């Protein structure tokens, strides 16, 4: 899903270094002799910060073919694909970039983790999604944790791992209850109570069958 709230949070981290990024993203030769390309990179960032992800991707892709941009810019490209609902390409870029950007600020990384997890989830690659949701939980703000626990619960539920599903649904319920300001909290609290009960019933089925 598109999540403008997360995008805006990420942009707060970008603004500090935004003016330096075009300089350090390209080779020294490009910085000296191809100023139009540094301008192109700056324009790609402008498009990105304005939510014009398709236009941003066109410029990033052209520059990447010529110079091979660094991992952080590949992560930007992954986010662009995510916001364009192209989850396969989002996974391709984010899977490659994430191991190389561990030195970045925690909350910036949390947005890459969540976007990658959501991309795998939407591709029904639930086992692949879980580790990225878990990484997101480790570094995100408390009011953002519920969404990842909620998704992890579904990942396990789709694999019929009822105990793990129930545990994560319970964690999601706890965080949504603690943070009612989250947009989806009210509807998900009601849903989660039903989901938890359903998981508990599934956990009882093998025990009940022993007494038949």
Question: Where do the model's predicted regions map?
Answer:
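Alpha-helical segment of the N-proximal tetratricopeptide repeat
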Residues: 36-62
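Canonical tetratricopeptide repeat
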Residues: 76, 115, 151, 185-188, ...
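Terminal, low-structured helical/coil segments at or just beyond the last alpha-helical repeat
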Residues: 174-212
């Amino acid at each position: 899903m598109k999540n403008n709230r997360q995008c805006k949070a990420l942009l707060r981290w970008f603004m500090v270094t935004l003016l330096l990024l075009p300089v350090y993203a390209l080779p020294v030769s490009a910085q000296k002799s191809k100023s139009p390309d540094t301008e192109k990179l700056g324009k790609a960032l402008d498009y990105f910060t304005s939510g014009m992800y398709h236009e941003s991707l066109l410029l990033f892709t052209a520059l990447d073919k010529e110079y091979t941009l660094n991992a952080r810019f590949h992560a930007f490209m992954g986010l662009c694909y995510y916001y364009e609902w192209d989850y396969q390409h989002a996974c391709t870029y984010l899977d490659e970039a994430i191991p190389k950007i561990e030195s970045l600020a925690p909350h910036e990384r949390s947005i890459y983790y969540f976007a990658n997890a959501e991309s795998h989830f939407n591709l029904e690659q639930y086992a692949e999604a879980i580790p990225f949701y878990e990484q997101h939980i480790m570094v995100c703000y408390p009011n953002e944790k519920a969404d990842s626990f909620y998704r992890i619960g579904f990942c396990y539920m789709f694999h019929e791992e009822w105990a793990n599903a129930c545990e994560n649904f319970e964690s999601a319920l706890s965080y949504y209850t603690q943070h009612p300001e989250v947009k989806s909290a009210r509807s998900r609290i009601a849903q989660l109570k039903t989901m938890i009960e359903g998981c508990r019933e599934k956990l009882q089925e093998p025990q009940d069958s022993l007494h038949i």
